[in-house]
């Protein structure tokens, strides 16, 4: 598997996580929607599924890991940033095969692609604190 296939899986997964957070639809429905309506060429579909279902099933645990390192209330974090840091935290915590530098860098890149102007700085700082306190 190529790194680019995982990168594409992360991009698709963060969009699906964002959609799931806002819609509160069943994860299986969100997954089906994304896999049938989005271009999945070059996407590691199995990894996309794992990220989406993993984040959804472990959201409470992931959020508890993040909250001590926030500079604001969790409710004040934008939905896009929540989706990104939840995905990256899932990889940092539950995917030991993903080097922490890769998980952080991918989170930063997702924030640059989907977040507000300085989202990448917030994501970088938060994930860096999380790694240092693990």
UniProtKB/Swiss-Prot annotation:
Pfam families the UniProt entry points to: NusB
Keyword Lyase (UniProt): no
UniProt entry tagged with the keyword Plastid: no
Record's keyword terms, sorted: RNA-binding, Transcription, Transcription antitermination, Transcription regulation
Residues that span the membrane, as ranges: none
Family matches, as InterPro entries: NusB-like_sf (IPR035926), NusB_fam (IPR011605), NusB_RsmB_TIM44 (IPR006027)
GO molecular function, one term: RNA binding
A biological-process GO annotation: transcription antitermination
GO terms under cellular component: cytosol
Function: Involved in transcription antitermination. Required for transcription of ribosomal RNA (rRNA) genes. Binds specifically to the boxA antiterminator sequence of the ribosomal RNA (rrn) operons.
HAMAP family: NusB
Family: Belongs to the NusB family.
Protein name, UniProt field: Transcription antitermination protein NusB
Encoding gene per record: nusB
């Amino acid at each position: 598997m190529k790194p680019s296939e995982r990168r594409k899986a992360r991009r698709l997964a963060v969009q699906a996580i964002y959609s799931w957070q806002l819609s509160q639809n069943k994860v299986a429905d969100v997954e089906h929607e994304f896999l049938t309506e989005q271009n999945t060429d070059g996407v590691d579909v199995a990894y996309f599924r794992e990220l989406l279902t993993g984040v959804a099933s472990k959201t409470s645990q992931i959020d508890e890991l993040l909250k001590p390192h926030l500079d604001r209330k969790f409710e004040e974090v934008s939905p896009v940033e929540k989706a990104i840091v939840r995905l990256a935290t899932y990889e940092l915590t539950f995917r030991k095969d993903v080097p922490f530098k890769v998980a952080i860098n991918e989170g930063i890149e997702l924030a640059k692609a989907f977040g507000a102007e300085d989202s990448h700085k917030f994501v970088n700082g938060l994930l860096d604190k999380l790694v240092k306190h693990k």
